[in-house]
């Protein structure tokens, strides 16, 4: 699905992706932060590109509207020339393709002198500035820039006329960045009818797979749009870098976080993406344990194991896939690994790292959602510990709400929505707790993380009041 916007473009960002890379930019044409540009996680390749036609830049003054979806199309008006700037990330391309459609507004023959400036910045995401030198090679219709073992190719089907010497440029998209401009690249077109110019930015390695296609339609128009936008958003985060996986978020969370992945799989399975879900669960299962995160580069790619909800979420997601489709032997092995990670105290409470919950900025021992997820997992997997965990969950129940954790200084959070969602609370109590959620957690943007009546509540607090899509879906 695509939609068209023409207002507040400077406040909106767009992302175009395939299984290999993503390009992020502002819809007003800008590359405004160090996270903008072309990335093949976890490496950056391009800080920005700029286009000038007959001496006029395609920028916030020229752009009239933007169509946004699986591609990004910017509509410009430049000195009597209509320009459509289309940015796509084809599945068979380890990079992006930019196509300019040029048309004279008065239908008279007109020359279009087009200049492309590219700010190349090949570096790891952990670096702001790399001091390695570039090697630049030119050939017919191409420019290749290499730094270390990574390279970026600028190619075109048109005659690519490179002029001027390469130069280093400092710029400040929020923070100081350095890039190299290989020279100015020129194209020329005589406009009698509509003409096109295309060029590509491609990296040194690629993933050329594609995601299975599904088509679902809702009779309710708004729900139909919401569902399709949600699926598109998830697909934008899928990569084939260290096996198939889902990055936690653009632009900076460039790893496969288990928690984010398994929650997302619940929706993907419901939407019918069975083979994709199987591949992702298999990718986690074939590791030594079920890791809390898979990094896309480095020697210790699964070193982080701090997610306390990784194992129960894996068990729940695997069960859901099995009921809807199938699971393979590797996923079965993953299920056994996950089961062994359950630890319970004498009161039937699940033990876990205080820093390992989704609210990882808070120290939360014996958290209610971990208890609830393990209870749901034991029921799905017919584990003997189910009865103990049911008794343990009763310790969280309070007269007017469910405790967030069993700490003495407990606060009212949205996390009790999880046992409510899984039907683990008796109906009479559930109604009472839902009334509190509706009164204290509901906002125009969704479900708050913390009750607005808490002394430390902050509407912009990461885990202390802001509304999340995750918490809203639970509620």
Language-model segments: residues:
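Well-ordered alpha-helical scaffold segments within catalytic/enzyme domains
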Residues: 262-274, 312-327, 372-384, 418-428, ...
């Amino acid at each position: 699905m695509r939609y068209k916007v023409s207002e507040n473009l400077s406040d909106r960002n767009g992302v175009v992706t395939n299984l290999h890379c993503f390009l992020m930019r502002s819809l007003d044409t800008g590359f405004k932060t160090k996270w903008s540009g072309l990335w093949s996680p976890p490496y950056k390749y391009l800080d920005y590109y700029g286009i000038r036609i007959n001496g006029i830049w395609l920028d916030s003054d020229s752009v009239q509207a933007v169509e946004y979806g699986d591609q990004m199309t910017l509509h410009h008006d430049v000195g009597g020339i209509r320009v459509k700037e289309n940015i796509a990330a084809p599945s068979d391309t380890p990079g992006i393709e930019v196509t300019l459609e040029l048309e004279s507004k008065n239908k008279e023959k007109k020359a279009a002198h087009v200049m492309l400036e590219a700010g190349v910045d090949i570096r790891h995401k952990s670096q702001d500035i790399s001091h390695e030198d570039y090697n630049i090679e030119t050939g017919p219709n191409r420019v290749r820039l290499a730094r270390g073992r990574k390279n970026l190719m600028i190619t075109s089907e048109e005659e690519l006329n490179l002029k001027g010497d390469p130069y280093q440029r400092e710029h400040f998209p929020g923070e100081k960045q350095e890039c190299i401009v290989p020279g100015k690249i020129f194209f020329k077109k005589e406009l009698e009818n509509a003409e096109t110019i295309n060029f590509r930015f491609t990296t040194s390695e690629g993933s050329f797979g594609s995601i299975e296609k599904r088509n679902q339609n809702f009779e309710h128009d708004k729900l139909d749009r919401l569902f399709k936008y949600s699926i598109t958003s998830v697909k934008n985060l899928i990569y084939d870098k260290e096996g198939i996986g889902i990055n936690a978020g653009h632009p900076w969370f460039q790893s496969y976080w288990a928690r984010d992945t398994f929650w997302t799989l619940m929706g993907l399975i419901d939407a019918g993406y069975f083979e994709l879900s199987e591949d992702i669960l298999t990718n986690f299962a074939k590791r030594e344990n079920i890791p809390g995160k898979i990094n896309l580069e480095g020697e210790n790619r699964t070193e982080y194991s701090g997610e306390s909800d990784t194992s129960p979420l894996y068990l729940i997601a695997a069960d859901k896939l099995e009921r809807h489709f199938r699971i393979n032997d590797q996923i079965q092995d993953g299920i056994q690994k996950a089961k062994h990670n359950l630890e319970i105290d004498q009161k039937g409470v699940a033990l876990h790292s205080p820093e390992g919950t989704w609210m990882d900025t808070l120290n939360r021992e014996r958290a209610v959602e971990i208890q609830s997820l393990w209870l749901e997992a034991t029921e799905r997997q017919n584990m003997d510990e189910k009865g103990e965990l049911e008794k343990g969950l009763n310790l969280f129940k309070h007269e007017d709400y469910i405790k967030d954790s069993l700490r003495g200084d407990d606060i009212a959070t949205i996390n009790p929505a999880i046992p409510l969602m899984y039907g683990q609370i008796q109906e009479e109590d559930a109604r009472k707790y839902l009334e509190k959620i509706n009164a204290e957690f509901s906002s125009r943007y969704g479900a708050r993380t913390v009750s607005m009546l808490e002394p430390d509540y902050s509407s912009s607090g990461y885990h202390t009041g802001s509304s999340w899509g995750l918490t809203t879906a639970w509620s």
